[in-house]
Amino acid sequence: MKSTTLVSVLALGAAATFSTPTFAQETYFPIIAKGFSHQFWQAVKAGAEASAAKNGVTITFEGPNTEAEIDKQTDILNAAIAKNPQGLGFAALDSQAQIPALQKAADAGIPIVAFDSGVDSDLPLTTCTTDNVNAAGAAADKLAEAIGGEGEVAAEIHDQTSATGIGRRDG
């Protein structure tokens, strides 16, 4: 939960730092995740909601039903950008597919904070993520040790389009 809170605080901080204060304007910050169903995303949502309540920020937590719906995530992202939020938190299902939408956000002056999975772009102000290459490498070392350094091992990666999946594969 610490990393979830960190992502939320960084995202909300970026929104507060880079938005223009307006009297009686509510601070609105959409958080667009990769999905809802996995326990991980439920923890991210809970952390984001707790941080938003603590900081007096209104958030939405949205994402596609499954982590295979890249087009749906793009639609959600475009709808959020159209509401002209003070900032945007985003976990990309595909490291390249949403770059045009993120460019629209950047052009509109909406600060972007990427989390969990980055994009192949410098549009986000920052990306908060695990070093998946090193984490997967450490796991592979432990597995090799457990099997005595010999034998065959299969790696099944959850996807080949997100920075998370690619990093875990390459580690």
Model-predicted regions and their roles:
Residues 1-24:
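Gram-negative bacterial Sec-dependent N-terminal signal peptides
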Residues 2, 22-171:
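A residue-level marker of the well-folded mature domains of exported/periplasmic proteins
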